[in-house]
Amino acid sequence: MKVLFINSVCGIGSTGRICTDLAQQLEAEGNEVKIAYGRKGTVPEQFQKYAVRIGTDFDCKMHAIQTRLFDTHGFGSKHATKEFLKWAEEYKPDLVWLHNLHGYYINVEMLFDWIKKHPEMQVKWTLHDCWAFTGHCSHFTMVKCEQWKSHCSYCSQLRRYPACFAMSSVSKNFERKRKAFTGVKNMTLITPSKWLADLTRQSFLKEYPVEVHYNTIDTSIFKPTPSDFRERYGLQDKIIVLGVANVWEDRKGLFDFYKLAEMLDDRYVIVLVGLSEKQIKELPKNIKGIQRTNSPQELTAIYTAADVFVNPSVEENFGMTPVEAQACGTPSIVYEDTACEEIARQNGNTVVPQDVNALYESITGHKFAGGVTNKCTIICIPRTNSPQELAAIYTAADVFANPTYEDNYPTVNLEAQACGTRVITYDTGGCRETIDGKTCEYLTKTK
């Protein structure tokens, strides 16, 4: 069987690694696999045999400019999509497995027109957020919007991803998506959390069967891994509270970490992995920032070094980081009423109400093995694309905190748990599904 994955990235980032993990599994079963991707980024050498680039960096930039000006995300990249579909027509896949279609790289109308012309193909679509059934945004829990259930006419998040700073096309986008994404034969939707599945069944995609497939981790990588992480950052006598995200913003709980940093005493330090250089420069002194890493080995070492992993995301679909932290021996804390709670409660982690005070009480009430009583600092480190570095950070931390509001399914929660670090997160989005309330916890988010 010929299988074609379509995703924004290949082999990097959470969705990129999910695609390559599935590709390896399918290839081992005797299938031929390709992964079509569009965003700039180095494909790891071991996955280059799968990779097929859609368009160029210039195409992505032009698509982004169109989005900024006309709010037409997903409807640009016509030439790039045309050339890709010529290749796909020759490849003749038996199974087309869609993942993230947003990301400034493909024209979804042209893609679905082609799919509908081939009813003989099996189609799967793994949703990692809510973009497919809204007129603009990828998450709406934090702003408490329910327009997507019937028709999006106005978006209060127009300047958030995929940001537009000029003309709004929210209403038109909603109808174009509805027309493009409905009426596909043999298509099954997959979500990594019950939370997202429930939302999907309330949208115009309700005509399709929806399956819940929880994201999994490689326990041969995410396991307790000793490292010199604490020594390198001078944290030998600190209780490390760890947070990990691909991109840090308010819905991921970044500001909850800021509040937490003001509340924790000098015994603690917060380490945040996945920050931009600009964010790191703006951090308070008691937070250590690390840039994003695509190295599972680095992540494992960080997970192992941490004392607790916290995922305060409120819109996570299904965060892998709490599970990864736990696999590395670090307990996790997440927020309730999120997808993170689903998995958290299954894996002996702590789930707390969505409130920074509850997060604080859970962290300070935890009895850490080292009995550390000296000064504490919140650590933020420049973003890293090395999973190995991330794993090392997870492991080194005492607590992983994820105060995100809108994560679909925060893999950082699973990663921190897999590395043995305790996670604390909010009970919104998919966060609830990543925490089971035994060794990690979630908090109820309140204003």
Spans of model-derived segments:
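Conserved donor-binding/catalytic core segment of Leloir-type glycosyltransferases
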Residues: 234-252, 258-262
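Conserved acidic donor-binding segment of nucleotide-sugar-dependent glycosyltransferases
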Residues: 349-356, 365-367, 437-447
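Nucleotide-activated donor-binding/catalytic signature segment of Leloir-type glycosyltransferases, i.e.
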Residues: 274-297, 371-384
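Aromatic "clamp/platform" in nucleotide-sugar-dependent glycosyltransferases that forms part
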Residues: 314, 405
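Membrane-proximal helix-turn-helix segments that form the acceptor-binding/catalytic region
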Residues: 147-189, 202-204
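Short hydrophobic beta-strand element within catalytic cores of glycosyltransferases
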Residues: 331-334, 413, 422-425
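Acidic anion/phosphate-binding donor-loop and adjacent secondary structure
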Residues: 198-201, 217-232, 281, 368
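Short alpha-helical donor nucleotide-sugar binding micro-motif in glycosyltransferases
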Residues: 302-306, 393-397
